[in-house]
């Protein structure tokens, strides 16, 4: 940072230094903030307004968590005003000991953003200590022969205060023999020396008592005293003399204990006992006496304890040499301790944010720390470094203060925490280092969406499953932590109707298990697709979708249903006519059945259960075709009955039965008298009356129902077909996945409008547009047959005369044996049949059979036996044609004729059928009817 920081002092006895120019938005200050306070300031006293000096408002004090930190915290910050307050007793002599300049270094830390400011509090000395002598009484022995002006060094007083409050001067009590002289020590201190002014005379006065007073420079001054007791002895007039007054020695702090550092030497010109010299410490501090030892006979000085430059840089000792005659002299020994690189750097964490958001950008401060090396010079210069492979770096904010900041993007899913090792190395030789490891936890952010184990799921569920059972399970994982990684599942879309989705499936929000809410029916619902969503609990939440396709497998739960032969409108069995001259291989009729199942479960086989003449007819195993085995014999009955069983290929197989009534006749006139003329019983009068009453009642009821039905249909239809009166079909399907109820509840629903012209002589009917929505809950095929028969039955009795004029069968109806349809498109008449190549072929075959059944009421096929019809009247059964699946038309045979559905398709397409007698066939059929 550029610029300079000036200082100002507070008014009053407390001197406080403030910065005149303080940068507000820099991470660190160019110079530390300085305050000056006297020692022994009362607790709670205000040092200065730290918030103001830092440029912070009162609101910022608590918002940015202004605080101070130090190794020993003597100060605190008022959270309301931002004042820096005295927290603990401040004793300058205890804190700074002998240092003349006493400063306390603090760090002011603020958050949001994290920053640090340096504070120096100068502790000013207060005159709270009086000078003090180590001994309250000083005993001296002075020979009477001592010459005038002889000086005797006295013990110095100690005053912990500094500057003006330190020791200022000495005073001696008034006397006529001695005066006091103050001399300066090399270290700047003062010591007193007692100077003889008058010759002593032991015989006159053998002892002298004086008072030595030490005064400091305080206001008011403080003092300390010591009693001096001087004993006058006989003359030993030559005191010992040191070779030099001051001895200086430089000593490395790493010298081991027991090392000799210096030998002092004193000589005495006296002889005898007065020349024997002993050495001793005189007025030496206890600390120095613990570190050094003195040989009292040789004057050799040894180390007793390890030296520590960081604790004491210099030792000053007074050595006294005394002869046996009690004469003494003193010298000074100054030991300079030379610093060695014996202290490793220290790392002190001042602030640490151990929780770091993983979306923190580079440059975010996560920790503040400082280094300290007690060595001096290059031994105390410290460099910091980080362990490798961590996305952090160190910024030096000021002298020995550092910031640990992010250097790269963080990813908790890859590394949830970092053990960052900070290494500090000094520049000594050899260098010393230390390290500190801090753990930084990365706080999770919802930055990962759930991921499904599969891109899509496919599950097969058999139909008629247990409701409530699980059918599938989806699983998604989220690498985030806690709520951000907690996944819940839900259904969000489906190809089913949304309002009925909950009645089909549900999903467990916790486990992802999909449950079936109902039993599925393959015939109604073969497949459906769900869209499931996995969502975590983060804010904002993240989600992922996956599709689940459910295939409903078929089970053999539907028995075959016989479409032909069907019962008549009055419940009587219909019959087929067979020419008497029918030859072996002649196609008599065909049993038509369907199975709503699929696959093997819908592969039908036909079996003869019972026959009037077992050897007269054969039944195709797969086709259901009834053919002549031999010609009709004279002994054979004209009326034949066959009981046919239709079985599917399921395990176990299901079956249905149908009864065929066959009449051998060359014309319809031979058959009708047997069915229309009944012998009258003897009591026919009463029976006739009963039947008449019942018939009249039924006719009245039917008439009323017909009128009501006609009115209702008129109201529901938006228009009336021009062809005549129409009846709405009940064969229709509902929208959605619900299957059709027609025939055997299969999957090929159709709905038609059934219209009959008003001309009873031309009972042709057509199918028009399909109806979209109408319920179908019963077997409508039989209803259609009954309706058709009820409409056409009156014409049978009315046209008996026309029947007698029936034209002979048209030879164009006949097909050769090779032209007759076989199974699966073959024309060789093989009854074994072939299995469809795939499921599509099977479904197409079922569609063909259902379509052929639906053609029972198709208006495009005339009742007169035109091309494409079965050649039967309304009384004898429904008409079967095929117009939806042309590939399978040849598999459906039209009983009573040699035509196939291909002819009917040609007629619908506007093409003339094979043969030129189409009109004659139609008129002939009308005459038969």
UniProtKB/Swiss-Prot annotation:
Signal peptide per UniProt: 1-30
UniProt biased composition (Basic residues): 919-929
GO process terms (BP): homophilic cell adhesion via plasma membrane adhesion molecules; nervous system development
GO molecular function terms listed in the Swiss-Prot or TrEMBL record: calcium ion binding
Residues in the Extracellular compartment per record: 31-691
Subcellular location: Cell membrane
Comp. bias (Polar residues): 807-838
GO cellular component: plasma membrane
Stretches assigned to the Cadherin domain: 31-133, 134-242, 243-347, 348-452, 453-562, 570-675
UniProt name for this protein: Protocadherin gamma-B7
Membrane-spanning parts: 692-712
UniProt source species: Pan troglodytes
Topology Cytoplasmic: residue spans: 713-929
Taxonomy, superkingdom: Eukaryota
Predominant cellular place of this UniProt entry's protein: membrane
Membrane topology: Single-pass type I membrane protein
Residues linked to a glycan: 419, 545
Region (Disordered): 806-838, 899-929
Keyword line: Calcium, Cell adhesion, Cell membrane, Glycoprotein, Membrane, Repeat, Signal, Transmembrane, Transmembrane helix
Role according to the record: Potential calcium-dependent cell-adhesion protein. May be involved in the establishment and maintenance of specific neuronal connections in the brain.
């Amino acid at each position: 940072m550029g610029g300079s920081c000036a200082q100002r002092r507070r008014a009053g006895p407390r001197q406080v230094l403030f910065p005149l120019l303080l940068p507000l938005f820099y991470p660190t200050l160019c110079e530390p903030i300085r305050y000056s306070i006297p020692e022994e300031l009362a607790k709670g006293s205000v040092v200065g307004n730290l918030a103001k000096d830092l440029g912070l408002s009162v609101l910022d004090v608590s918002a940015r968590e202004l605080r101070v930190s130090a190794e020993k915290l003597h100060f605190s910050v008022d959270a309301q005003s931002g004042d820096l307050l005295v927290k603990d007793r401040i004793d300058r002599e205890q804190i700074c000991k002998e240092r003349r300049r006493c400063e306390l270094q603090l760090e002011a830390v603020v958050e949001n953003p994290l920053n640090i400011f340096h504070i120096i509090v100068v502790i000013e000395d207060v005159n709270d200590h009086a000078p003090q002598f180590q001994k309250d009484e000083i005993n001296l022995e002075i020979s009477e022969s001592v010459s005038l002006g002889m000086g005797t060094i006295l013990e110095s007083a100690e005053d912990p205060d500094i500057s003006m409050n330190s020791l200022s001067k000495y005073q001696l009590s008034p006397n006529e023999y001695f005066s006091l002289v103050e001399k300066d020590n090399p270290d700047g201190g003062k010591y007193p020396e007692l100077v003889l002014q008058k010759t002593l005379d032991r015989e006159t006065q053998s002892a002298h008592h004086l008072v030595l007073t030490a005064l400091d420079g305080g206001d008011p001054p403080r003092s300390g005293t010591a009693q001096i007791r001087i004993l006058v002895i006989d003359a030993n007039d030559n005191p010992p003399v040191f070779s030099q007054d001051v001895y200086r020695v430089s000593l490395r702090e790493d010298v081991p204990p027991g090392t000799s550092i210096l030998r002092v030497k004193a000589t005495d010109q006296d002889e005898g006992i007065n020349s024997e010299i002993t050495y001793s410490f005189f007025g030496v501090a206890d600390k120095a006496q613990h570190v050094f030892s003195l040989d009292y006979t040789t004057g050799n000085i040894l180390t007793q304890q390890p030296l520590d430059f960081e604790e004491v840089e210099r030792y000053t000792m007074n050595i006294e040499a005394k002869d046996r005659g009690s004469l003494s002299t003193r010298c000074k020994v100054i030991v300079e301790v030379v610093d060695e690189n014996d202290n490793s750097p220290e790392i002190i964490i001042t602030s640490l944010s151990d929780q770091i958001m993983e979306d923190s950008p580079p440059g975010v401060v996560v920790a503040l720390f400082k280094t300290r090396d007690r060595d001096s010079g290059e031994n105390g210069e410290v460099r910091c470094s980080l362990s490798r492979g961590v996305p952090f770096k160190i910024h030096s904010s000021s002298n020995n203060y550092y910031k640990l900041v992010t250097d790269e993007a963080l990813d908790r899913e890859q590394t949830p925490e970092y053990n960052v090792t900070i290494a500090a190395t000094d520049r000594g030789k050899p260098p010393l280092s230390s390290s500190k490891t801090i753990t930084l936890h990365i706080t999770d952010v919802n930055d990962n969406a759930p991921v499904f184990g599969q891109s899509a799921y496919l599950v097969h569920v058999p139909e008629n499953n247990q409701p409530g059972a699980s059918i599938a399970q989806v699983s998604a994982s989220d690498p985030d932590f806690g709520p951000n990684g907690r996944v819940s599942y839900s259904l969000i879309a489906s190809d089913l109707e949304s309002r009925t989705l909950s009645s089909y499936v549900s999903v467990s929000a916790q486990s992802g298990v999909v449950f079936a809410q109902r039993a599925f029916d393959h015939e109604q619902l073969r497949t459906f697709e769900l869209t499931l969503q996995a969502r975590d609990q983060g804010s904002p939440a993240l989600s992922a979708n996956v599709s689940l396709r459910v295939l409903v497998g078929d089970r053999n739960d539907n028995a075959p249903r016989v479409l032909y032969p069907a019962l008549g409108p009055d419940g009587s069995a219909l019959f087929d006519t067979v020419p008497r001259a029918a030859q072996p291989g002649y196609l008599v009729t065909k049993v038509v059945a369907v199975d709503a199942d699929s696959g093997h479960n819908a592969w039908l086989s036909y079996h003869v259960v019972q026959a009037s003449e077992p050897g007269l007819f054969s039944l195709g195993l797969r086709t259901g075709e009834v053919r002549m085995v031999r010609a009709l014999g004279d002994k054979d009955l004209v009326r034949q009955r066959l009981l046919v069983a239709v079985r599917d290929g399921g395990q176990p197989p299901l079956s249905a039965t149908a009864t065929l009534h066959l009449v051998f006749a060359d014309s319809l006139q031979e058959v009708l008298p047997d069915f229309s003329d009944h012998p009258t019983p003897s009591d026919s009068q009463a029976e006739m009356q009963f039947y008449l009453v019942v018939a009249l009642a039924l006719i009245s009821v039917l008439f009323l129902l017909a009128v009501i039905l006609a009115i209702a249909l008129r109201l529901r239809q938006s228009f009336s077909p021009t062809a005549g009166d129409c009846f709405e079909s009940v064969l229709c399907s509902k929208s959605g996945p619900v299957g059709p109820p027609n025939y055997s509840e299969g999957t090929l629903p159709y709905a038609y409008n059934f219209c009959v012209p008003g001309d009873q002589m031309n009972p042709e009917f057509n199918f028009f547009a399909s109806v979209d929505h109408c319920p179908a809950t019963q077997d409508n095929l039989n209803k259609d047959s009954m309706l058709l028969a009820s409409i056409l039955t009156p014409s049978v009795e009315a046209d008996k005369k026309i029947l007698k004029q029936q034209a002979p069968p048209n030879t164009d109806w006949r097909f050769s044996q090779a032209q007759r349809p076989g199974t699966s498109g073959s024309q060789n008449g093989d009854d074994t049949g072939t299995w469809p190549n795939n499921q599509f072929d099977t479904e197409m075959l079922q569609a063909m059979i259902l379509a052929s059944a639906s053609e029972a009421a198709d208006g495009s096929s005339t009742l007169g036996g035109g091309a494409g019809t079965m050649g039967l009247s309304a009384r004898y059964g429904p008409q079967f044609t095929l117009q939806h699946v042309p590939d399978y038309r040849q598999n459906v045979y039209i009983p009573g004729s040699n035509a196939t559905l291909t002819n009917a398709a040609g007629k619908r397409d506007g093409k003339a059928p094979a043969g030129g007698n189409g009109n004659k066939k139609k008129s002939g059929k009308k005459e038969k009817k």
